[in-house]
C-alpha cells in the first residue's frame, strides 16, 4: 500500500532540527541558514518525514540549503516528490534558478542531475575550511564542494 504524502510550506521554526542534521552536521550552520528561509516538509500520517530548506540569494535566484528524509523513509521516493513539488512551486513563483552545494561524491550527485541540475563550479577545501569536524561519507572525507545550478 502506497503511503499518502502531504507536502506543504511551513515556518522555519517548526522544522525539526534533528531532520536537518541528517544532511548538515553543523547545528550552527543550520541555524544560520534556517532564519528567514523558505521551508517545505513531507508529512506522512501527521509525522514530518522530509524537509527542504531554501533561501533567497537575490530577486529571482534561490539556494537549496538542505533536503533530508528520515533514514527509515529514504529510498522510497519521498525526496524526489518533495524536490519536484518545490521546483514546481518555485517555477510558479517565477524564480529563474535554483543553486545548491554538495560533496563531490555520493548518491546525491545522481539525484540532483535527474532533476536537471548542472555542475557550475567547485569550491576547493570547502568542507575542511568551513566545518570544525571532518565530515565522512562512506568512509571518505569530504573536502571539496560541487556547486550545482538549475535554470527554471
Identify the meaning behind each predicted range.
Residues 1-12, 146, 152:
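Conserved N-terminal entry element of GNAT/NAT acetyltransferase domains
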Residues 99-101, 113, 118-139:
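Conserved catalytic-core motifs of GNAT/GCN5-like acyltransferases
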